[in-house]
Curated annotation (Swiss-Prot):
Binding partners and assembly: Forms homodimers and heterodimers with FOXP2 and FOXP4. Dimerization is required for DNA-binding. Self-associates. Interacts with CTBP1. Interacts with NCOR2 and AR. Interacts with FOXP2. Interacts with TBR1. Interacts with AURKA; this interaction facilitates the phosphorylation of FOXP1, which suppresses the expression of FBXL7. Interacts with ZMYM2.
Biased composition (Low complexity): 402-419
Function per UniProt: Transcriptional repressor. Can act with CTBP1 to synergistically repress transcription but CTPBP1 is not essential. Plays an important role in the specification and differentiation of lung epithelium. Acts cooperatively with FOXP4 to regulate lung secretory epithelial cell fate and regeneration by restricting the goblet cell lineage program; the function may involve regulation of AGR2. Essential transcriptional regulator of B-cell development. Involved in regulation of cardiac muscle cell proliferation. Involved in the columnar organization of spinal motor neurons.
UniProt-recorded name of the protein: Forkhead box protein P1
Domain commentary: The leucine-zipper is required for dimerization and transcriptional repression.
Gene it is expressed from: FOXP1
Record-annotated DNA-binding residue ranges: 462-552
Amino acid sequence: MMQESGTETKSNGSAIQNGSSGGNHLLECGSLREGRSNGETPAVDVGTADLAHVQQQQQALQVARQLLLQQQQQQQVSGLKSPKRNDKQPALQVPVSVAMMTPQVITPQQMQQILQQQVLSPQQLQVLLQQQQALMLQQQQLQEFYKKQQEQLQLQLLQQHAGKQPKEQQQVATQQLAFQQQLLQMQQLQQQHLLSLQRQGLLTIQPGQPALPLQPLTQGMIPTELQQLWKEVTSAHTTEETTGNNHSSLDLTTTCVSSSAPSKTSLIMNPHASTNGQLSVHTPKRESLSHEEHPHSHPLYGHGVCKWPGCEAVCEDFQSFLKHLNSEHALDDRSTAQCRVQMQVVQQLELQLAKDKERLQAMMTHLHVKSTEPKTAPQPLNLVSSVTLSKSASEASPQSLPHTPTTPTAPITPATQGPSVITTTSMHTVGPIRRRYSDKYNVPISSDIAQNQEFYKNAEVRPPFTYASLIRQAILESPEKQLTLNEIYNWFTRMFAYFRRNAATWKNAVRHNLSLHKCFVRVENVKGAVWTVDEVEFQKRRPQKISGNPSLIKNMQTSHAYCTPLNAALQASMAENSIPLYTTASMGNPTLGNLASAIREELNGAMEHTNSNESDSSPGRSPLQAVHPVHVKEEPLDPEEAEGPLSLVTTANHSPDFDHDRDYEDEPVNEDME
């Protein structure tokens, strides 16, 4: 009997030392904090209240252990003195689970394996936190109950030595059995919790595994810190505020550190991927690629340079970059401050992006609504219905203009007999078109430059004027109304920041305009060659000279602002509807070409075919026609576009905006001309 008692006592002692059901995190926190204080310097200070609470819990558990050891020693001594009572000792022994007394330590290597297997989502963290808190409450209640039972058992043992009745011994035995059942239930709950963690791929620790010595915690994580992280998840409004604490429970929640949870290996343990919480901010989704699969890809490494903000250290290879990252950008106050600054930068950029998107949406909405407002015009004498025009355009190519509503304007046809001609619709054209609104909308160049002088001087924005208009303005602003070529160059660079670069291109264009336009006259004087402006000749080369009915002129000017060329789809629809003068075949027909020439003569449209106007970068032709006796003076076609005869207006395919906006730096063919 004595041998059996001794054997069971040893088994109980071994069970106390080697049991492995869940761990007491409070005791573990105390022991690990002691190890941290004795060994490594702690990465983060712990509050005095938390430390005092942990020390109290540790002392209470140590006292409980001492009481158990004393009880076992007393039982052994009593067993030696009174061998008759040894048969009753097994019923009075209280098996204690290591789950209640010995903490289960999760080493950094094990936590790394856990995180590589699966990354918890915020919802899973919430569930695990609730389970952990419930287990902690049950564990504390069980510890208190265990202490009370130990005291009662000690009293009962004293009474038993005094010679009590067998009924009381049976009651003690039943209480002992009930207590054992509660301990077993607690063990089962903890085992189920561990099994659930294993099923979720979060825990791969074998039972009875001894705790390894504490290692540096700058790249590790202990269960107590994980528990603290879970508590912060419940207290925070968003789960993003706490994921940056995972290196060594660094408290960055006050500055909303968020971003160490996107990838599978980027939470805590992997120094190659975590980079002190400096991954993509506010991205809760998981990334399928890990740095183990692609060892040479890293957000902070590119082209042999460290991309850490403010670093830009040159690293020969990826391994040297990792060494540099772990040495120079370890978890310290400087790296933490840089991380906070980067977060603020990202937040400001996101805010600015949201504002710019809202502004862009408002601009698009405004322009869309404005373009759909129809412009009124006098009732024409003979025209194709604008409704039919818009309908045919939409039927011909429903996808060609998805966001460009058409606004047909009323065309103007001559009073003489001839084929009906329609005007173009207001559609947004696609292409490198620069609008010269000073010429189209009758905005004087002098007033525009005066109003936006500071803007043009500081912003590298191309001025919305032709080179000829700018040269004329430069000459007119001079006191003597004449400038040398170098003085014209200086005026361009002084007035516009845009011309302070690419000097070879625009200076070549200026020389071409001076040489090829008749309105610019070269005069020889004592200073050398100077350039002046022939104002009469300059006014001749303007796109339109309209005289006649004032109301008609007003309507034409209003409609001019909304006229753009037809696209290919609209031309095809007109060809199907047999609309003359707008199909490619009809344009190539000599009979229709002669008819168009006769119509132009009846309208007194004078065409200027000069070398000056062939190279002109001034505003192009207007697609509007004039009613007799309105006189329309128009620019000629460019050489590459003068293949077919003109229609009543100019040509069917002609884009007034495009030719009007054409400048010499866009035509390298002419740049060799002097």
